[in-house]
Amino acid sequence: KVEAQLKVVNEGGSISTDTSGATPAISVSDADAVTLIFACGTDYKMELPNFRGEDPHDAVTERIKAASKKGYETLKADHVADHSALFSRMELGFDEEIPQIPTDELIQKYRNMVENNGGEVPTTAEQRALEVICYQFGRYLTIAGSREGALPTNLQGVWGEGNFAWGGDYHFNINVQMNYWPTLASNLAECQTAYNDYLNVLKKAGRYAAAAAFGIKSNEGEENGWLVGCFSTPYMFSALGQKNNAAGWNPIGSAWALLNAYEYYLYTEDTDYLKNELYPSLKEVANFWNEALYWSEYQQRYVSAPSYSPENGPIVNGASYDQQFIWQHFENTIQAAETLGVDADLVAEWKEKQSKLDPVLVGDDGQVKEWYEETHFGKAQAGDLGEIDIPQWRQSLGAQSGGVQPPHRHLSHLMALYPCNMISKDNPEFMDAAIVSLNERGLDATGWSKAHKLNLWARTGHSKEAFQIVQSAVGGGNSGFLTNLLSSHGGGENYKGYPIFQIDGNFGYTAGVNEMLLQSQ
């Protein structure tokens, strides 16, 4: 149930209402000033099993009354103080002057430069200013959209009218995690509380998914494993799979989700949170994979099966995407257990499994392999069988250009480089292979994918490619930032046909600039 109330406060003049029509109307005449006070609420409560709290009427009514007593100036001062306490914690600048032109015009000038279309282009100072504005806009969206006691941010908003994009869901195969990539390094740790709290409820529903998909059950009082597939909702949908789309199979979702949560601990060093909330979840998912991993005689390693590399190629055993996140999850859980001084017997089991995952494999083109059977780009060979084209390789529905599929927007086989940390400059063989794979994927993409590529290239230390993606994102139009600064997924041919707002591109850009300037692994 949703309730909204609007109060109109006039200074001078007169006010009247008309309820005779289909839509009630409020009219103000000859006023010196008008203040609109709006409040809304729902009876949603983030609590299993029915997610139903109290009727919102009393709370919304009280909020309107309290705001009315404060008045406009006090309300504004409260808002500025609340926002500034978070936003003003850090500054980023390159001695650029703030341009005195509207942002949409500045974006258009920058786009002219990127597209080389002959239009007016920005000065160097204007370029730096806009790049910083886009960075700080990601922090602004974090502050505005993710606060304690609320739901975490998602793709486009949770509560929408009609059949809006992605149904207002949470995508756990990169998107919701990307939303929180910049939060901690941008000194906004409090803004991740909503995400952490959501995971604490999601895991309870996720035990049903683990039982249904893998037969690993948690009876009353047991915590034997929890999963979330590609999609979730405010009502903790966690099932794996999607009709006619392999992308729904994402058993690694919970391990990836907890990577953000573990980084929250690393930044805050909140040992109470680690001990009482996070470690039980880490341990539960580690125990799940300790049981669910399958020893493949053919591959001579433990593998996740069945396995899928979002959103590219066929269903396989041991896709690099799964293997890398399982390795990282074991690593984080082992570190957490050793920090707390607990579960030494389990740590030994986890280390044994982790040592036999072999999560990064190098192919014949020098690339990080996306699948075990991959040989060259787009080719695969299993055992003594002949080499074949990889089924559904580069399948990007709606992105064809002249009948040719562009490089795929997902880079699921490079998670060990970012957001994980198995690939680093300390391992040049793997780093070189990651660079080969990055070059194959190219610099162009849709908005959120550019953001991921920005973080990946930043991790390699290749400033030229990283900055090219900064420019491609800021000046990317329908496959980058729109003139209102919101990031676009981009629909139609080559992701440039028409805009689809998708907020993770904003957050990923901010995270990428963080990585370009300062890295903590």
Model segments located where?
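Acidic/polar, glycine-enriched structural segments that form the non-catalytic walls/loops
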Residues: 1-170, 189-211, 341, 400
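The feature captures the catalytic groove of carbohydrate-active enzymes
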Residues: 46-49, 53-57, 154-169, 222-275, ...
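Active-site core of glycosidic bond-cleaving carbohydrate-active enzymes
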Residues: 172-175, 184-208, 221, 246-267, ...
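Secretory-pathway/luminal and periplasmic proteins that interact with or process carbohydrate-rich
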Residues: 140-151, 165-172, 191, 204-210, ...
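Flexible glycine/proline-enriched surface loops and loop-helix/loop-strand junctions
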Residues: 20, 122, 161-166, 173-180, ...
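Active-site-adjacent bridging/hinge elements
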Residues: 95-113, 149-157, 220-239, 254-261, ...
